[in-house]
């Protein structure tokens, strides 16, 4: 499915400007013309979005709230009525898969995008020498080299220093469950295991997911 022209810059930013798979994902997430038009002019306040898109402020507010609640866009915290797109593909994936009522097709398309299409762009991302989107931190395990994980990155220090902690359904396990890859997963079922801290935790509370 072709990408809507308004969302092509976003698809390019995510690294998939020619992906029909991402086009299908966008078709599920942005289901109406107003959603596409609003997403195409983010970031901004409701007033700014209205001016850029030509959509009435009340309609912008209504659509933006719905998109944020469903994990499609993110509200800019500490700035009234302001929204943004997720800057990385994995953030968009994580935010949407923990929304309970998306169709199975969405999970199937995420599986194709991440497992079949993403590996093709990894060499390009490495050549650009961009900072990593995430890091895997050993939990209370000995790290051979002090340069591998900074002390400020240790899990214990992150949790102790957090001003706010929330727990949400694990996006990775949720995705795996929906596509049949989690048969041997030892994690307990129906337990919120993914911890969010500080700003990410605020976003969880603002959206109303997790605990």
Where are each of the predicted segments found?
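Long, low-complexity, charged/polar intrinsically disordered regions in eukaryotic proteins
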Residues: 1-24
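Short secondary-structure capping/turn segments at boundaries of alpha-helices and beta-strands
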Residues: 22-27, 71
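Short helix-coil-helix linker/hinge
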Residues: 28-35
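Short acidic, hydrophobic short linear motifs in intrinsically disordered regions
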Residues: 36-54
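A short, conserved structural fragment
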Residues: 68-79
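Short, amphipathic alpha-helical interaction segments positioned at domain boundaries
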Residues: 79-118
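Catalytic cores of enzyme domains
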Residues: 118-211
């Amino acid at each position: 499915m072709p990408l809507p022209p308004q969302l092509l810059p976003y698809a390019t930013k995510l690294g998939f400007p020619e992906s029909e798979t991402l086009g299908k994902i966008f078709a599920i997430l942005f289901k109406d013309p107003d959603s596409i038009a609003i997403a195409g002019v983010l970031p901004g306040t409701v007033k700014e979005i209205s001016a850029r898109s030509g959509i009435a402020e009340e309609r912008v507010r209504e659509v933006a709230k719905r998109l944020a609640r469903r994990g499609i866009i993110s509200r800019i915290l500490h700035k009234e009525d302001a929204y943004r797109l997720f800057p990385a593909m994995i953030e968009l994936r994580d935010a949407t898969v923990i929304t309970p009522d998306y169709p199975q097709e969405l999970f199937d398309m995420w599986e194709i995008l991440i497992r079949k299409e993403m590996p093709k762009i990894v060499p390009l991302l490495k050549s650009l020498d961009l900072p990593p989107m995430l890091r895997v931190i050993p939990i209370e395990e000995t790290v051979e080299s002090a340069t591998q994980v900074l002390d400020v990155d240790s899990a214990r220090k992150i949790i102790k220093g957090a001003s706010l902690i929330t727990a949400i359904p694990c996006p990775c396990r949720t995705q795996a469950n929906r596509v049949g890859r989690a048969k041997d997963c030892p994690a307990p079922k129906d337990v919120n295991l993914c911890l969010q801290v500080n700003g990410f935790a605020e976003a969880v509370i603002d959206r109303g997911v997790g605990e």
